[in-house]
């Protein structure tokens, strides 16, 4: 399984959280991981486990970034798909030093092109660029 496919599985798990009081549904997680089990290698399985766990544990902080840079949009007005993609990418940007920020942003844009509307990729790119710029100023 490529890292891109692992990100897709992770995004699906984060998406499920939006419908389960912002917690991972163990049964749903097992289903998603079972679908990709043939292709999972250890590193990608670890990535999925870690990114979903860190996203879940730091949801409030991640959502604060989304709220801050979602001009004229409340977080509850965002589509669950877009919200999940943003949460996953911001989690990567904040907590995965081994993943370049540009890679996280580009992969989020690709997820949006695949799973969301035509305009979502630009919107997601804009929010993530602002998050990255703020974090670069803080470092």
From Swiss-Prot:
It holds the Pfam family NusB. It comes from the Bacteria. Keywords: RNA-binding, Transcription, Transcription antitermination, Transcription regulation. InterPro entries: NusB-like_sf (IPR035926), NusB_fam (IPR011605), NusB_RsmB_TIM44 (IPR006027). GO terms for molecular function: RNA binding. One of its GO terms (cellular component) is cytosol. This is Transcription antitermination protein NusB. It comes from Natranaerobius thermophilus (strain ATCC BAA-1301 / DSM 18059 / JW/NM-WN-LF). The gene is nusB.
């Amino acid at each position: 399984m490529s890292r891109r496919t692992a990100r897709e599985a992770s995004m699906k798990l984060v998406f499920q959280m939006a419908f389960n009081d912002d917690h991972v549904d163990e049964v749903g997680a097992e289903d998603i991981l079972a679908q990709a089990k043939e292709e999972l290698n250890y590193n990608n399985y670890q990535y999925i486990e870690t990114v979903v766990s860190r996203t879940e544990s730091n949801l409030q902080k991640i959502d604060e970034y989304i709220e801050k840079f979602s001009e004229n949009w409340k977080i509850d007005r965002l589509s669950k798909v877009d919200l999940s993609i943003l949460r996953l990418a911001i989690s990567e940007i904040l907590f995965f030093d081994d993943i370049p920020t540009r890679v996280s942003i580009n992969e989020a844009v690709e997820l949006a092109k695949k799973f969301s509307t035509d305009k979502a990729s630009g919107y997601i790119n804009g929010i993530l660029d602002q998050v990255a710029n703020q974090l670069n100023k803080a470092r």
